[in-house]
């Protein structure tokens, strides 16, 4: 299948605390993407600083790391055709106020500082983030019985 790729999706502490984990997983499954990695974890400050290294000079960096370290997160790897681009569309805009209804942030968020979910913004970012959060042996390669009903 052309353009079959993987993306990193993380449900942030506010999404976990609000009980939205199942709803978010449901949306990705119903779209037809395949879950190949999942962790429920308390991310270390070091991991978070490395994950957000591109934002280290921004004034909100320390607050972002503190927020992401404030509770458990759900780290996931999803696989499918154009999953990075489509996943970003499903998430909505970084600022929930700019997100359309029907997107995760458009349906469940109000403020940018509590936008419940992270998604890789490119295939290259996805590869980096997946390598940061998962060891290769933690990713499961399998064939879904639904695959022939989703892809031509």
Curated annotation (Swiss-Prot):
It comes from the Eukaryota. Its EC number is 2.7.4.6. GO terms for molecular function: 3'-5' exonuclease activity; ATP binding; DNA nuclease activity; GTP binding; identical protein binding; magnesium ion binding; nucleoside diphosphate kinase activity; ribosomal small subunit binding. Autophosphorylation at His-118 increases serine/threonine protein kinase activity of the enzyme. Interaction with the SET complex inhibits the endonuclease activity. One of its GO terms (cellular component) is cytosol. Its cofactor is Mg(2+). It catalyses: a 2'-deoxyribonucleoside 5'-diphosphate + ATP = a 2'-deoxyribonucleoside 5'-triphosphate + ADP; a ribonucleoside 5'-diphosphate + ATP = a ribonucleoside 5'-triphosphate + ADP. Major role in the synthesis of nucleoside triphosphates other than ATP. The ATP gamma phosphate is transferred to the NDP beta phosphate via a ping-pong mechanism, using a phosphorylated active-site intermediate. Possesses nucleoside-diphosphate kinase, serine/threonine-specific protein kinase, geranyl and farnesyl pyrophosphate kinase, histidine protein kinase and 3'-5' exonuclease activities. Involved in cell proliferation, differentiation and development, signal transduction, G protein-coupled receptor endocytosis, and gene expression. Hexamer of two different chains: A and B (A6, A5B, A4B2, A3B3, A2B4, AB5, B6). Interacts with PRUNE1. Component of the SET complex, composed of at least ANP32A, APEX1, HMGB2, NME1, SET and TREX1. Within this complex, interacts directly with SET. Also interacts with TREX1, but only following translocation to the nucleus. This is Nucleoside diphosphate kinase A. It comes from Homo sapiens. The gene is NME1.
């Amino acid at each position: 299948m052309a353009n079959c790729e993987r993306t990193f999706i993380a449900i942030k502490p506010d999404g976990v605390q609000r009980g939205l984990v199942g709803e978010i997983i449901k949306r990705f499954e119903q779209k037809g993407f395949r879950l190949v990695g999942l962790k429920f974890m308390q991310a270390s400050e070091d991991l978070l600083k490395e994950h957000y290294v591109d934002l280290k000079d921004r004034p909100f960096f320390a607050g972002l790391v503190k927020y992401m370290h404030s509770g458990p997160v759900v780290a996931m790897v999803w696989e499918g055709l154009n999953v990075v681009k489509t996943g970003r569309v499903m998430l909505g805009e970084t600022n929930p106020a700019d997100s359309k209804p029907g997107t995760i942030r458009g349906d469940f968020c109000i403020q940018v500082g509590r936008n419940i979910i992270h998604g890789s913004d490119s295939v290259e970012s996805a590869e980096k983030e997946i390598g940061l959060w998962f060891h290769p042996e933690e990713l499961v390669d399998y064939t879904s019985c639904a695959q022939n009903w989703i892809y031509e």
